[in-house]
A protein has these predicted regions:
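Bacterial N-terminal signal peptides
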Residues: 2-12
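Accessory carbohydrate-recognition regions in carbohydrate-active enzymes
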Residues: 18-202
Length: 202
């Protein structure tokens, strides 16, 4: 009886997982990213605390989610985004992988030398439920993101270089979001801690 129950349980779970996988394939995560949709693109789970995805250089109304279909600039990957609101906020803790010397500023569109931002190769962008990846053309880096209920996970594949680095940007957010107090410290060889207090719409 126990063996039969186990077999039936496994079969039932397999059916549920198969259905979930099938439904996820139909999700278009880019709906609402053009026009005035203000929709965030990136990695998250339903009702999760993290919305991990790219944040762009422009701070105009159509970019309040940090992403717009017409633009491929990336200043980094922020852990929190508002989606569909039409007003920007959050963008807390932006992470940007870099190679070589960079100006540690947001920069201006069309002028990469003014900041650390990169163009993203949107032709190779992957955005599916729970996973996001895109190549950063300036640095030759592949960025991959995923998320759990409370944590954003990053994986960066760098080219061979002695000048590879990861920038933790506590200053630059997005539209309406302004950092008021920030702090970061190195705890040990594997840990950092800090905070970012910002003022925005919400």
């Amino acid at each position: 009886t126990i063996a039969l129950f186990t077999a039936l349980s496994c079969s039932a779970l397999s059916c549920v997982n198969a259905k979930m996988d099938t439904y996820a394939k139909h999700v278009d995560t880019r709906i609402g990213t053009g026009g005035h949709g203000h929709v965030f693109v990136g990695a998250n789970v339903p009702f999760g605390m993290v919305q991990l995805g790219p944040t762009s250089v422009p701070q105009e109304w159509d970019w309040t989610s940090g992403y717009h279909a017409s633009d491929s600039t990336v200043i980094g990957f922020s852990h929190t985004h508002l989606s569909g609101t039409g007003i920007g906020d959050l963008f807390d803790i932006t992470v940007m992988p870099v190679v070589g010397k960079s100006v540690y500023e947001r920069g201006k569109v069309g002028q990469p030398e003014t900041g650390l931002w990169s163009y993203a190769d949107r032709s190779k962008e992957i955005s599916i439920p729970g996973y996001y990846s895109v190549p950063l053309t300036r640095y030759g880096i592949l960025a991959e993101l995923t998320a759990t209920d409370r944590v954003g996970l990053h994986r960066y594949t760098f080219p061979k270089s002695e000048e590879a680095a990861i920038v933790l940007d506590l200053e630059n957010g997005g539209c309406w979001d302004k950092a008021e107090d920030t702090h970061i410290e190195v705890v040990d060889g594997n840990s950092i801690r800090g905070w970012r207090h910002s003022k925005g719409w919400a």
